[in-house]
UniProtKB/Swiss-Prot annotation:
It comes from the Bacteria. The gene is rplD. One of its GO terms (molecular function) is structural constituent of ribosome. Residues 45-77 are annotated as: Disordered. One of the primary rRNA binding proteins, this protein initially binds near the 5'-end of the 23S rRNA. It is important during the early stages of 50S assembly. It makes multiple contacts with different domains of the 23S rRNA in the assembled 50S subunit and ribosome. Forms part of the polypeptide exit tunnel. The keyword Glycosyltransferase does not apply. InterPro entries: Ribosomal_uL4 (IPR002136), Ribosomal_uL4-like (IPR013005), Ribosomal_uL4_dom_sf (IPR023574). One of its GO terms (cellular component) is ribonucleoprotein complex. One of its GO terms (biological process) is translation. Belongs to the universal ribosomal protein uL4 family. NCBIfam families: rplD_bact. This is Large ribosomal subunit protein uL4.
């Protein structure tokens, strides 16, 4: 698969970037995509929730009233879950929601997501660029030239480019990442994906 390489003004450079069919044109595996996205979202959960059970509540353990003869239900400690301020029954405890997936499945999921976006014509390739100083205005002009300033976009860099990254941090609709940070969730969450020309080789070698 070949795609025209654009410059930062949105015009064709006359060059074509070759996208590997083994990465950008496979039959998507929906279940692999589902598992990888599920793992990504699970890993975002902090899992710090905690409720005190009756043994952890501060208070007296004396019996509230005598066992028999009151005509009402028997009752023990004030920390019982049936009373206001009592402990929680089977309350949430801190836990790690993350789970593991093997590398081959994660690789398949990423290739499936890229193939979906390629099939939807949602992928662009532009020549490598950088800024002398971080400036949001410069980055916004690039997005406007590409026609994606109002779309949720993902820009994938080949090498770490600090000024480009800093120029994008103030924008809600775009995210700049390095090729090593590319994930199935981020691919699917973006309406448009822009690859810098230098990022393709690293992505294809990692996923092939």
């Amino acid at each position: 698969m070949e795609i025209a390489v654009l410059d930062i003004k949105g015009k064709e450079t006359g060059r074509k970037a070759k996208l590997s069919d083994s990465v950008f044109a496979i039959e998507p595996n929906d279940h692999a995509v589902y598992l990888d996205v599920k793992q990504y979202l699970a890993n975002q959960r902090q899992g710090t929730h905690k409720a005190k059970e009756r043994a952890e509540i501060k208070g007296s353990t004396r019996k509230i009233k005598k066992q028999k003869g009151t005509g009402t239900a028997r009752a023990g400690s004030i920390k019982s879950p049936i009373f206001k301020g009592g402990g929680r029954v089977f309350g949430p405890r801190p836990r790690n929601y993350g789970f593991k997936l093997n590398k081959n499945l994660k690789r398949l999921a990423r290739k499936s997501a890229l193939s979906i976006k390629a099939n939807d014509k949602a992928i662009m390739v532009i020549e490598d660029f950088s800024f002398d100083t971080p400036k949001t205005k410069n980055f916004t002009e690039v997005l406007k030239a590409l026609g994606i300033e109002s779309k949720k976009s993902l820009i994938v860099l080949g090498d770490s480019n600090k000024n480009v990254y800093l120029s994008s941090r103030n924008l809600k609709t775009s995210e700049v990442i390095s090729s090593s940070e590319l994930s199935t969730y981020k691919i699917l969450n973006a309406k448009s994906i822009v690859f810098l020309e230098g990022s393709l080789e690293g992505i294809e070698s990692k996923l092939s």
